[in-house]
Amino acid sequence: MSLSKEVKAQILADFGRGENDTGSTEVQVALLTAQINHLQGHFKEHIHDHHSRRGLLRMVNSRRKLLAYLKRTENERYQELIKKLGLRR
């Protein structure tokens, strides 16, 4: 299940550089993090849902690659983002 429009709009307001910024690395990572956190509740209830687990792993890998890119290019923004999101890095 995807995120609601209100949640997405709040993430865009919190992490976007501008009003219509949907493609910056910070916004993409924040959206993926919210979706990953949302799916964790699903997996507590549906332990054997392996098809959705594959999608979750794809999201985690995508987020990992985006974070590696951000760390390589703009380390200050990377540090700020992981602090805001509470990621263990």
UniProtKB/Swiss-Prot annotation:
One of the GO biological process terms: translation
Subunit structure: Part of the 30S ribosomal subunit. Forms a bridge to the 50S subunit in the 70S ribosome, contacting the 23S rRNA.
Name of the protein this chain belongs to: Small ribosomal subunit protein uS15
Sequence similarity: Belongs to the universal ribosomal protein uS15 family.
Matches recorded under Pfam families: Ribosomal_S15
Taxonomic lineage of the native organism: Bacteria, Pseudomonadati, Pseudomonadota, Gammaproteobacteria, Alteromonadales
UniProt source species: Shewanella loihica (strain ATCC BAA-1088 / PV-4)
CDD domains registered for this protein in UniProt: Ribosomal_S15p_S13e (cd00353)
Cellular compartments per GO CC: cytosolic small ribosomal subunit
Single Gene Ontology MF annotation: rRNA binding
Annotated keywords: Ribonucleoprotein, Ribosomal protein, RNA-binding, rRNA-binding
Function: One of the primary rRNA binding proteins, it binds directly to 16S rRNA where it helps nucleate assembly of the platform of the 30S subunit by binding and bridging several RNA helices of the 16S rRNA.
